[in-house]
Swiss-Prot record:
Residues 539-548 have a biased composition (Basic and acidic residues). Disulfide bonds: none annotated. The gene is mqo. Signal peptide: none annotated. Belongs to the MQO family. This is Probable malate:quinone oxidoreductase. GO terms for molecular function: 2-hydroxyglutarate dehydrogenase activity; L-malate dehydrogenase (quinone) activity. Pfam families: Mqo.
């Protein structure tokens, strides 16, 4: 019965797309150099790059909702962290010999520096306005308890001191000092409990929805940019000249139009996979998606909000994905401070918060069903974790909160459903299929269409991700003297690493902090810490990571 239902659904979708395409032929075809599918931060960032690099190119953006930045980019649908690995312990895994690996943390931090430079440049151009409306200084802290976790944090702190990107980080195991940094976390805690924390003053809270809205508003000021809302892509067809004909339905009046584009970017968040499959490019056959949602507890009580100014990340418990770390965060949303705690994983077959329950089924094909099955069979611990999260009661979530806020009161908190994150499943020659954390740009060989898949670190690295896309699909132009000069004006550190260069790191942090109105003091000498006593890591199968 399920197979019959799925087949009928696929036939209905296919017939609808054919019908739409036929109707669209009757209307005049619109032509554009660049078609941006999705009104989120990725499309907005790519459009902003291209507006500066090729101001004469025409651009069209289509968004199925009635406004831009209403899905994952919306400030309430994500954690709003400027991910720079200052506090996220999953970016510094423990090696088999007990040592700490910092390669991933360095890469994440380097990427966020590119985002800071990109945003600062847009502020200087007048594209982004009033930096405090979208980015604010909020210290980033790691907080752990228990002998093994304290040893881990000691070792992590020591390892990160090898990088110029993490200078200025503080470390303490003193209850009084940590209480000064994060009083809400320490008040009511057992004074004998062994705890440790790191703190970096230059952490940030970012409203990616506000950045998206401002970038798109600036693009709209140009006559060769068009924004079409309530417009859903129903079909993509490659033409003989390697352009694309994209059929777009107007969800308000039921009409359809064809847009002929030289380059198509699919930046549709969770919906990107299905649209990539619709394009028919062979590269799409390697991918499948698995949706995971997230919930947060939210407090707007001034007694709570005014008592906490930090993002405090913990360590994932045994058997949980490393990325699932609980955190209690100061957020600044629409000019108002709130505190969020979570995330708690949820499950829905929707690929978007405003998506369809058919999303998962309709994206499952003969080419990706086996990789999906392999991932499910190979990651039973992950399946078990997701089931346990879905089964959490209100009391369970409140008890989790009290581990980070011992004096929390139920009446101060409400539950909020954030966005959907579609995890990448990729075909693998050895394992059949693997779950991939991170984002991935998928494009055809001709560089005429590209999609962004994945969820983490996502919005905080939109600027470097779109730089990667430019290099992948516009390689010849990127290597030209003209584009090179402009890219280095947009991102001063473009083409080189900041890590290891103390002077360059401080120069870029000082520059971006000044333009973006962020706090930046010259780093002090590192804190002295007890020598970590890390043991070799036990041999055990690791839980696959996911983004929440």
């Amino acid at each position: 019965m399920k197979k019959v239902t799925a087949m009928l659904f696929s036939m209905a979708v296919g017939l609808n797309a054919v019908s739409m395409a036929a109707k669209a032929k009757a209307s005049e075809e619109q032509e554009t150099d660049v078609l941006l599918i999705g009104g989120g931060i990725m499309s907005a960032t790519l459009g902003t790059y291209l507006r500066e690099l090729e101001p004469e190119w025409s651009m069209t953006m289509v968004e199925r909702l009635e406004g831009v930045a209403q899905e994952s980019s919306n400030g309430w649908n994500n954690a709003g962290t400027g991910h720079s690995a200052l506090m996220e312990l999953n970016y510094t895994p423990q090696n088999a010999d007990g040592s700490i690996s910092i390669e991933k943390a360095v890469a994440i931090n380097e990427a966020f520096q590119i985002s800071r430079q990109f945003w600062a440049h847009q502020v200087e151009r007048g594209v982004l306005r009033t930096p405090r409306s979208f980015i604010n200084t909020v210290p980033h802290m790691s907080f752990v308890w228990g002998e093994d976790n304290v040893n881990f944090l000691r070792a992590r702190y020591a390892a990160l001191q090898q990088s110029s990107l993490f200078r200025g980080m503080r470390y303490s195991e003193d209850h009084a000092q940590i209480k000064e940094w994060a009083p809400l976390v320490m008040e009511g805690r057992d004074p004998q409990q062994k705890v440790a924390a790191t703190r970096t003053e230059i952490g940030t809270d970012v409203n990616y929805g506000e950045i998206t809205r401002q970038l798109i508003a600036s693009l709209q000021k140009k006559s060769n940019f068009s924004l079409q809302l309530s417009s859903e892509v129903r079909a993509l067809k490659r033409n003989d000249d390697n352009t694309w004909t994209v059929t777009v339905a107007d969800l308000k009046n039921g009409t359809a139009q064809n847009i002929r584009a030289k380059f198509v970017f699919i930046g549709a968040g969770g919906a990107a996979l299905k649209l990539l499959q619709e394009s028919g490019i062979p590269e799409a056959k390697d991918y499948a998606g698995f949706p995971v949602g997230g919930q947060f507890l939210v407090s707007e009580n001034p007694d709570v909000v005014n008592h906490h100014l930090a993002k405090v990340y913990g360590k994932a418990s045994v058997g949980a994905p490393p990325m699932s770390v609980p955190h209690i965060d100061t957020r600044v949303l629409d000019g108002k401070r709130v505190v969020l705690f979570g995330p708690f994983a949820t499950f829905s077959t929707k690929f978007l918060k405003n998506g369809s329950l058919w999303d998962l089924m309709s994206s499952t094909t003969t080419s990706n069903v086996m990789p999906m099955m392999h991932v499910g069979l190979d990651n039973f611990d992950l399946v078990k974790y997701l089931v346990s999260q879905v089964m959490l009661s209100e009391e369970d979530r409140f008890e989790a909160l009290k581990e980070y806020y011992p004096q929390a009161k139920k009446e101060d908190w409400r539950l909020w459903q954030a966005g959907q994150r579609v995890q990448i499943i990729k075909r693998d020659a050895e394992k059949g299929g693997v779950l991939r954390l991170g984002t991935e740009v998928v494009s055809d060989q001709q560089g005429t269409i590209a999609a962004l898949l994945g969820a983490s670190p996502g919005a905080s690295t939109a600027a470097p991700i779109m730089l990667d896309l430019l290099e992948k699909v516009f390689g010849d132009r990127v290597s030209s003297p003209q584009w090179q000069a402009m890219l280095k004006a947009i991102v001063p550190s473009y083409g080189r690493k900041l890590n290891g260069d103390v002077a360059a790191t401080e120069r870029e942090l000082q520059y971006t902090s000044e333009v973006l109105g962020l706090k930046y003091d010259k780093p002090q000498a590192a804190d002295s810490t007890p020598k970590p006593q890390l043991k070799p890591k036990p041999v055990q199968k690791e839980v696959a990571d996911i983004a929440l």
